[in-house]
Amino acid sequence: MPRAPHSMPLLLLLLLLSSLPQAQAAFPQDPTPLLTSDLQGASPSSWFRGLEDDAVAAELGLDFQRFLTLNRTLLVAARDHVFSFDLQAQEEGEGLVPNKFLTWRSQDMENCAVRGKLTDECYNYIRVLVPWNSQTLLACGTNSFSPMCRSYGITSLQQEGEELSGQARCPFDATQSTVAIFAEGSLYSATAADFQASDAVVYRSLGPQPPLRSAKYDSKWLREPHFVYALEHGEHVYFFFREVSVEDARLGRVQFSRVARVCKRDMGGSPRALDRHWTSFLKLRLNCSVPGDSTFYFDVLQSLTGPVNLHGRSALFGVFTTQTNSIPGSAVCAFYLDDIERGFEGKFKEQRSLDGAWTPVSEDKVPSPRPGSCAGVGAAASFSSSQDLPDDVLLFIKAHPLLDPAVPPATHQPLLTLTSRALLTQVAVDGMAGPHRNTTVLFLGSNDGTVLKVLPPGGQSLGSEPIVLEEIDAYSHARCSGKRSPRAARRIIGLELDTEGHRLFVAFPGCIVYLSLSRCARHGACQRSCLASLDPYCGWHRSRGCMSIRGPGGTDVDLTGNQESTEHGDCQDGATGSQSGPGDSAYGVRRDLSPASASRSIPIPLLLACVAAAFALGASVSGLLVSCACRRANRRRSKDIETPGLPRPLSLRSLARLHGGGPEPPPPPKDGDAAQTPQLYTTFLPPPDGGSPPELACLPTPETTPELPVKHLRASGGPWEWNQNGNNASEGPGRPPRGCSGAGGPAPRVLVRPPPPGCPGQAVEVTTLEELLRYLHGPQPPRKGSEPLASAPFTSRPPASEPGASLFVDSSPMPRDGVPPLRLDVPPEGKRAAPSGRPALSAPAPRLGVGGSRRLPFPTHRAPPGLLTRVPSGGPARYSGGPGRHLLYLGRPEGHRGRSLKRVDVKSPLSPKPPLASPPQPAPHGGHFNF
């Protein structure tokens, strides 16, 4: 394997350092608020929970539903009531007390409970509250899951006319979404039209034009939508919502933010297609995402504002969050209205197969006039009514309501992203803040009860990053909790901005509260603190100090600050950011660092980059050191292996010397000659030239290596016990039992293998490890190639015992698995015993063409390789080999003969030493081999 160059760690380090700033720029960090505050010490009249004599409100709270501001009157829709607040009276210092209210209770609560609904769900929740005209108000409520609508006078809040059906105008359940708006005398509503909320509908009614609706149960039009906002603009009515995506259904239930529109002049289709349905319904995706190589999307629309001036163009501000099962995060994106209108001129998308991807439709397949166009205007100007449109246009718009591409954000990236805080839920925008009415301020509500006041990028700060001016904890558990869970009770579900009254109304499920847009009095007489807050609602007055700015400011308000002017009183050091108390003149200010403090501060990204660089550098240096150490150790180990003449216990070369065969070892190399390393890996097949087998052909293999004995292991007896090789079948009726020879001594069982050419025919009995080591490292006398090998006669060997004899053994300790140490014996030269009818278990497979009596596949003049065979206990077995060849026997001491023998395969040793011939000596009886 090629080694990595030493410069690779440095390249990886440079790549890491170069990627850190890009990663930081790709995903902005959460800004830190300059000022934090809460409503502790605020007047109790700042909250409104409901009527004091309402027992249900005392238990459940307000159950807020919707805000509506008309003619300096704030209308609050809630459970069973609509409250009216005079904003002029509130501005004069009165508390949050309604001057009028209407009560509309459900008369069908008993039937609602019979349907299996809870009592808390059977109240009349006012979900729709829109002005019908300048004098009349339309209110629709759930009415115990039987929605109804009424009209009321705006000033008197008295009912006018009869009740109307609320189906397709108001949802059945208070938890279902709905939006509604009047345009040219007709009510455009979007909600669920049935009890199960399975029929989502965009509906037009209550006007001079015929009622129209969206396609029923068609997921291409609407798929489980959650409607957020409705807007009339130009010739169209726009609906903003989120729904389960149809183009990415393979990813699961992924929600996308959408905007759909219909023509106000739409009269429906012909009887052949889209009769009493919209012929101009189109929708496209709103893209709020962080750009980069891998785009990070905020797909779930939570709230949207009306048109606000942004950089001289009309824009909508929306709050978006991530998917419910994704990393929690929120973002604020703005969309220009002209970009939205331009998006509806994009390409149509279609799905050509059931599991295929959605792709744009080529322009040559789009009929004319362009589907979705308003009749009498633009491309369909030649058609006076939508009912006159061609059928192919109507059928195409029915099957292709989705457009491509998505609408990009106004600044091509979010104005604000938050990933380490609670999720944003609501947004309100003041596009005319400050003394010159040219500053945009965002007010954001979250699901933990906090309100953020934010300057978007490019505002007063003239920077590219948003500035969180203030973070306010607006929730009060004592006033707003009710019977809800703490998490649900803290969620902000409504924001209403009163710029003339310099107030922000915040709605929780159980109450509403109003906040001042600024807290300039906290800066007191500290000019530096007042100006460092960057609050467009605060300014410095020479005589009155830091004061609130409402409307255009006079010449006596200093906005930039005169550094030479005298500061009134002591100022807290803005660099510390400490908050000693509400009375502090610079309570909570964290800006306007002094030059010395700014020079001493270290940016967090730079600190992280330094830590990563130090870690990478240390890892690379450690890797180099470890690599050098391992390389040196390998070089030293290879040098030790190549050095001849050093004794080593039981090394591969020692075994090769012990068991090797063939010619004498070569003489030591001369000076300058490289040492010849013997070949360690060789084959067991004979060489093609018919010569001697390789040097290591007699090396033992893992199968031939005997196992060490175990101390004090007794053999278990039984009538069905077999030996280790399973070959204790009957060997003849006339043979004595196993373990007893004819002379009264134990009969040994041996494994025999003919030696390969060049291997000695004699062996050395080795019973201890010390003897083996002495033999390995002892002197090597010269070999006598023609010296006859001494052998001991085997005529006195007793016959094999009966199969059942091995079942009864003495109680002496046995070696491991009942196998005593092996001994090398010399076979007799006499007559060989008849071969057993059972083939040797250690014989090779017939496929190899070797073994006892099988036909050899190679020429007979070539000596076959030495193989292992089994010899019965009664005498030596037949072995393959010519005359003059000797066998290698594996014997066992006398004291352990007759016991079961574990199968082992031992190859013949090839040793350059002259074999030490010794006849087998009987081991003393009762000898134990406990190692």
UniProtKB/Swiss-Prot annotation:
Pfam families (UniProt xref): Sema (PF01403)
Cytoplasmic side stretches: 627-931
Extracellular face residues: 26-605
Disulfide bridge map: 112-122, 140-149, 263-374, 288-333, 480-511, 520-538, 526-571, 530-546
Annotated signal peptide: 1-25
Parts of the chain that traverse the membrane: 606-626
GO MF terms, alphabetically ordered: semaphorin receptor binding
Single GO BP term: nervous system development
Ranges of compositional bias, category Low complexity: 693-708
Glycosylation (residues): 71, 287, 438
Residues covered by the Sema domain: 31-517
Keywords, in A-Z order: Cell membrane, Developmental protein, Differentiation, Disulfide bond, Glycoprotein, Membrane, Neurogenesis, Signal, Transmembrane, Transmembrane helix
Annotated region described as Disordered, given as residue ranges: 556-591, 655-747, 777-931
Purpose: May be a stop signal for the dorsal root ganglion neurons in their target areas, and possibly also for other neurons. May also be involved in the maintenance and remodeling of neuronal connections.
Family listed: Belongs to the semaphorin family.
Name under which the protein is recorded: Semaphorin-6C
